[in-house]
């Protein structure tokens, strides 16, 4: 299969894992004969011959990945429906003062029914941790003074605990609907609410997906996260080409569509022309721009705000998938040579972020985010499984970069290059993981007494801790752990 070729002769290379292309029998064949036809059925690659050896070296990881994605594909809709029912039930209990209040309201015929999209309908993430206020600065000044960086300055400088708290709370708030976000930003945070954008994104793969797209002189990037930013579609690998070249503009994307009247994302040439005009005029985020995908929507709005506020800087942040998109956003800005915007970037904070690319990608971004002054911090809590995915091994070569701020279950911060147990594998880690999950459950019952009512965990959060006894890496991914780490964290004295 030919690679996607650029005008200067360089090639885009890619590997797409397609679990839907084979059945269970093919999965078995992939396990037994990793270099056979059964294995090749699942892979679309620009250099298939080279990848055969890599599949053979890590066959069990490949097989488990394919099986998990097949299960997710089968159970996707039922899980979505179940999630909606659970979320509605939790909101029903919340707006009626929990179970006893709901029973009383049923007797009185005065049941409050939650409605999606309103300021009282909270996401599951928000129900796990109900805190809305930002960190109290007076409480911050009473205790710890060492945090993240030795830099000190006025206002929200990198390394300031208030800034990190704002980032982690913004990451939590991003799971909510527009009305909830607007209410919290205006009433609790006393800040200006810019807007809420429901960007169109194609289906993105899970962290168990090992598909990648390689940009010459930049490195390999996880395809699922590129899709989530709206920068391509694995159904047509050529679609990434137009978005990932230097000086990419929406006009150039339109000109690349030589057949028919639609772009690789289903947008008409006339629509793209209107979007391009809006970008050139720094106008506003129209519905057409919002639909075009997250990257262009955010870049347009950010450019407009930076023009209005000449001395302003901005921070990019996110949790889990949002963390992956947070670090890829400045990466694509650099690729597109948006140096004026990059010059206004204060930093990037991610929480529980999965790996987004290979070692070369990290080396490409180091001059912009790591050296000479670190501006990219990955916050990792204890046994959180997500930062350990996709696996970092010799077959797939996914690597983290930037400064890792690792917090153990005592909320002690360690500044490291890589979190311990980087692939969440190994018998020697298994028993400590389960013991730690038990400690976290016990800790959750005591937090309200040891640290004050602000840190008291509700029944739903404690239930998640109980589930964590069976799946410790999943419960550790909760934002409650990250908020507590930011607010209670103390710097390790041994490092």
Predicted regions and their residues:
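Non-catalytic, mobile gating and regulatory segments of ester bond hydrolases
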Residues: 2-317, 321-495
């Amino acid at each position: 299969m030919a690679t996607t070729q650029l005008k200067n002769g360089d090639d885009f290379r890619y590997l797409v894992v397609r679990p839907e292309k084979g059945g269970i029998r093919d999965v078995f064949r992939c396990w037994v004969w990793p270099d056979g036809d059964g294995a090749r059925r699942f892979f679309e690659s620009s250099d298939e011959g080279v990848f055969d050896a890599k599949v053979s070296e890590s066959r069990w990881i490949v097989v488990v990945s394919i099986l998990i994605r097949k299960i997710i594909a089968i159970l996707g809709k039922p899980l979505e429906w179940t999630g909606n029912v659970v979320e509605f039930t939790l909101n029903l209990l919340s707006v009626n003062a929990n179970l006893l209040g709901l029973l009383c309201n049923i007797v009185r015929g005065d049941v409050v029914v939650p409605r999606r999209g309103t300021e009282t309908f909270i996401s599951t993430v928000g129900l796990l941790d109900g805190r809305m206020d930002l960190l109290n600065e007076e409480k911050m000044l009473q205790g710890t003074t060492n945090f993240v960086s030795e830099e000190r300055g006025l206002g929200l400088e990198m390394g300031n605990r208030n800034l990190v708290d704002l980032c982690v709370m913004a990451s939590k708030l991003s799971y909510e609907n527009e009305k909830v976000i607007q209410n919290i930003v205006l009433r609790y945070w006393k800040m200006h609410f810019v807007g809420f954008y429901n960007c169109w994104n194609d289906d993105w793969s899970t962290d168990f997906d090992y598909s990648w797209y390689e940009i010459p002189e930049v490195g390999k990037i996880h395809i699922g996260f590129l899709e989530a930013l709206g920068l391509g579609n694995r159904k047509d690998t050529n679609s990434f080409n137009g978005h990932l070249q230097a000086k990419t503009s929406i006009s150039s994307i339109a000109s690349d569509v030589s057949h028919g009247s639609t772009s690789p994302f289903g947008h008409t040439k006339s629509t793209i022309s209107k979007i391009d005009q809006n970008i050139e005029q720094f106008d506003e985020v129209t519905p057409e721009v919002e639909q075009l995908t997250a990257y262009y929507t955010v870049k347009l709005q950010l450019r407009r705000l930076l023009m209005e506020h000449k001395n302003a800087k901005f921070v990019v942040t996110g949790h889990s998938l949002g963390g992956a998109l947070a670090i890829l956003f400045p990466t694509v800005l650099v690729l597109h040579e948006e140096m004026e915007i990059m010059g206004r970037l204060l930093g990037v904070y991610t929480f529980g972020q999965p790996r987004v690319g290979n070692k070369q990608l990290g080396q490409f971004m180091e001059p912009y985010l790591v050296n000479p002054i670190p501006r990219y911090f990955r916050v990792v809590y204890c046994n959180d499984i997500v930062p350990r995915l996709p696996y970092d091994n010799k077959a797939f070569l996914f690597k983290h970069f930037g400064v890792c701020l690792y917090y153990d279950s005592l909320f002690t911060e360690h500044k490291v290059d890589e979190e311990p147990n980087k692939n969440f594998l190994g018998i020697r880690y298994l028993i400590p993981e389960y013991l730690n999950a038990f400690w976290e459950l016990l800790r959750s019952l005591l937090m309200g007494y040891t640290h004050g009512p602000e840190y008291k965990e509700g029944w739903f959060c404690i239930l998640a801790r109980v589930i964590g006894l069976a799946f410790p890496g999943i419960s550790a991914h909760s934002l409650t752990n990250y908020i507590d780490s930011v607010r209670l964290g103390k710097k390790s004295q041994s490092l």
